[in-house]
Amino acid sequence: MKAKHQRLILAVAALCGVAGAGVLAASALRDEAAYFRTPVEIAGGKAAVGEAMRLGGMVAKGSIVRQADGLTIRFVATDGQASVPVEYTGIVPDLFGEESGMIADGRMRADGTFVADRILAKHDERYMPPQMGEMPKNMKAAVEG
């Protein structure tokens, strides 16, 4: 075989390998991909029952209700224009609380309740972990970059 043909075969094999890796990566991410929805979008009918999505908003004041099992909580997510009831079973993040930002991964139920599989608590850019409160200011600057 000539060197030109060997290079062509090598290039085609490399291209097939890259394409195969891309297909595998895309199929792996398909299950993880979820649309981000706000309560007003969900109230407007943009969320189908059973569709995997992320719900973002604020936890409404006075809406957190803990169930007797100690793990299940119910609360209302709001964006100031609409509200969505949320149910979650698991341990909530330390920063989760009333009037705090949150993002929940899950699905809508037919009764209009968002059933979350995971909850992330959002914080503003001024948040500082309690452990950093004890550090001298020059060390904080070095850690923060």
Swiss-Prot record:
It is a single-pass type II membrane protein. Residues 29-145 are periplasmic. It is found in: Cell inner membrane. Keywords: Cell inner membrane, Cell membrane, Cytochrome c-type biogenesis, Heme, Iron, Membrane, Metal-binding, Signal-anchor, Transmembrane, Transmembrane helix. GO terms for biological process: cytochrome complex assembly. Residues 1-7 are cytoplasmic. Heme binds at residues 123, 127. One of its GO terms (molecular function) is metal ion binding. Pfam families: CcmE. InterPro entries: CcmE (IPR004329), CcmE-like_sf (IPR036127), NA-bd_OB-fold (IPR012340). The keyword Membrane applies. The chain crosses the membrane at residues 8-28. GO terms for cellular component: plasma membrane. Belongs to the CcmE/CycJ family. HAMAP family: CcmE (MF_01959). Heme chaperone required for the biogenesis of c-type cytochromes. Transiently binds heme delivered by CcmC and transfers the heme to apo-cytochromes in a process facilitated by CcmF and CcmH. PANTHER family: CYTOCHROME C-TYPE BIOGENESIS PROTEIN CCME HOMOLOG, MITOCHONDRIAL. This is Cytochrome c-type biogenesis protein CcmE. It comes from Sphingopyxis alaskensis (strain DSM 13593 / LMG 18877 / RB2256) (Sphingomonas alaskensis). The lineage of its organism: Bacteria, Pseudomonadati, Pseudomonadota, Alphaproteobacteria, Sphingomonadales.
